[in-house]
């Protein structure tokens, strides 16, 4: 009898959920969890209504408003009629189809990829989808999670399955100890800088190595969150005691004997020794600096001690022209020190860096300091429960005393779909995940950084090396 072939974590979860495979490789995958928000769901629910279908498994579906909700006073009407309409539609659709829904006044409300793990809806070994590209966040728990389009949202609502083709396996190993001031955000920005925004195309990434194991669950979520910016379908980290401890006792997590049974399965969720990966890359955590993006792609990364690069040094013409356009859009000149770049706005929040650990890191920097007079700085907790925890720890008082605005939970300035957005040519230090043209507002200029780096920039009025912060 032959031994079982060593298998990757991705392959294990895929195989456990494979319902059917056609000759051309097209597969039908069972979906365990479906997260829904107000932007990509209205047409999907309308499709069900038109066809006379029900939601196949409402108990496996969780809806929340996040993209369009104002982060200021919610007792006032939403200033954008289209946003208000989408929010009202989600409330009505959830009621009509029997789906659990967290509205903007529910303390469980927040960014969809913050509330999933927080509620214990996200579990190891599950397949999770959402009409949102940053669904890869949930891979921090060893779940196979990725974004889907609106037509696929309807398909999952109706059938609890998804049609797709299997991806390849890539392992990203990060070993060594992170230096002081260097965070999970810097790890993932460094990875994207290494592989480029297309480097992960066609792959599911598994993050491994001692530096990844050393991260908290919040840090692991930050890493997995930006897998899509590296071009990957999803990102995974094998679950361990940190993941189990995070989930135990959460409202929607298994209890009692069900927990014990789940644990027996979860403990098998790791890539076997000798499992084949189609591609491997390695990074040394000890060599990583605090990172800032300088251009209009998440791959445009540079050390805080660096200078804006010169596109003239790039041999490939298409790439050179692309980087010249990025510099023109960002209003930067080659050779400018990163620490000489002044900012107008600062945003701490999003599904990348809106969790309690992120707010603690920012508060440590902000305590006893004052936001620069030329900077508007907002802090948006990732959920109502994160906000509640931060306030219990007095973090809100630290921020407010320093001149930061303390807001209600939501996607906020991560994307220009709500009142929190940049004006043309405003420059923002942001803890979000995308620095594309117009992402935070028409002609807005975004630099991606860690929470501590963002807070320090807001206080100094320009980017500073957090390793030298006093």
UniProtKB/Swiss-Prot annotation:
Protein name: 3-isopropylmalate dehydratase large subunit
Protein family membership: Belongs to the aconitase/IPM isomerase family. LeuC type 1 subfamily.
Positions of [4Fe-4S] cluster binding: 351, 411, 414
Chain coiled-coil ranges: none
Catalytic activity: (2R,3S)-3-isopropylmalate = (2S)-2-isopropylmalate
SUPFAM superfamilies from the UniProt entry: Aconitase iron-sulfur domain
Taxonomic source organism: Rhodopseudomonas palustris (strain BisA53)
Biological-process GO terms, alphabetical: L-leucine biosynthetic process
EC number: 4.2.1.33
Note describing how the cofactor binds: Binds 1 [4Fe-4S] cluster per subunit.
The keyword Acyltransferase appears for this protein: no
Function description: Catalyzes the isomerization between 2-isopropylmalate and 3-isopropylmalate, via the formation of 2-isopropylmaleate.
GO molecular function, one term: 3-isopropylmalate dehydratase activity
Keywords recorded for this protein, A-Z: 4Fe-4S, Amino-acid biosynthesis, Branched-chain amino acid biosynthesis, Iron, Iron-sulfur, Leucine biosynthesis, Lyase, Metal-binding
């Amino acid at each position: 009898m032959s031994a079982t072939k060593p298998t990757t974590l991705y392959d294990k979860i895929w195989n456990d959920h494979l319902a059917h495979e056609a000759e051309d490789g097209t597969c039908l995958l069972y979906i365990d969890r479906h997260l829904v928000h107000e932007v990509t769901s209205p047409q999907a629910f309308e499709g069900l209504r038109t066809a006379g279908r029900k939601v196949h498994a409402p108990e496996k579906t969780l809806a929340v408003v996040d993209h369009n909700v104002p982060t200021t006073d919610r007792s006032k009407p939403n200033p954008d009629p289209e946003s208000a309409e989408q929010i009202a539609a989600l409330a009505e659709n959830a009621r009509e189809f029997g789906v659990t829904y967290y509205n903007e006044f529910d303390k469980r409300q927040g960014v969809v990829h913050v509330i999933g793990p927080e509620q214990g809806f996200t579990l190891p070994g599950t397949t999770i989808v959402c009409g949102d590209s940053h669904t890869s966040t949930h891979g921090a728990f060893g779940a196979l999670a990725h974004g889907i389009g609106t037509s696929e949202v309807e398909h999952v609502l109706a059938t609890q399955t998804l049609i797709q083709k299997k991806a390849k396996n890539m392992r990203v190993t990060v070993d060594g100890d992170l230096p002081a001031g260097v965070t999970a955000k810097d790890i993932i920005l460094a990875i994207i800088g290494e592989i480029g925004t297309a480097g992960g195309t066609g792959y599911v990434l598994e993050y491994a190595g001692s530096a990844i194991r050393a991260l908290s669950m919040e840090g692991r979520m930050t890493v997995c969150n930006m897998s899509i910016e590296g071009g990957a379908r999803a990102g995974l980290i094998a679950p361990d005691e940190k993941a189990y401890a995070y989930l135990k006792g959460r409202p929607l997590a298994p209890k009692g004997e069900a927990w014990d049974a789940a644990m027996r399965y979860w403990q098998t969720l790791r890539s076997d020794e000798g499992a084949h990966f189609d591609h491997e890359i390695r990074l040394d955590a000890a060599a990583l600096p605090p990172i800032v993006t300088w251009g209009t792609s998440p791959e445009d990364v540079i050390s805080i001690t660096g200078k804006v690069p010169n596109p003239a040094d790039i041999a490939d013409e298409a790439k050179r022209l692309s980087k010249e356009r990025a510099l023109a859009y960002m209003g930067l000149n080659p050779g400018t020190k990163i620490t000489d770049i002044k900012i107008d706005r600062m945003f701490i929040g999003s599904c990348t860096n809106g969790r309690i650990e992120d707010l603690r890191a920012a508060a440590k920097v902000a305590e006893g300091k004052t936001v620069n007079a030329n900077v508007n700085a907002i802090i948006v907790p990732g959920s109502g429960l994160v906000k509640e925890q931060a306030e219990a720890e007095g973090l809100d008082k630290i921020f407010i005393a320093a001149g930061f605005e303390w807001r209600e939970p939501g996607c906020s300035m991560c994307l220009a779909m709500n009142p929190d957005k940049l004006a043309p040519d405003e420059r923002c230090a942001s803890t979000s995940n995308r620095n594309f043209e117009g992402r935070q507002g028409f002609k807005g200029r975004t630099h991606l950084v860690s929470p501590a780096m963002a807070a320090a920039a807001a206080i100094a009025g320009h980017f500073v090396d957090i390793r030298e912060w006093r």
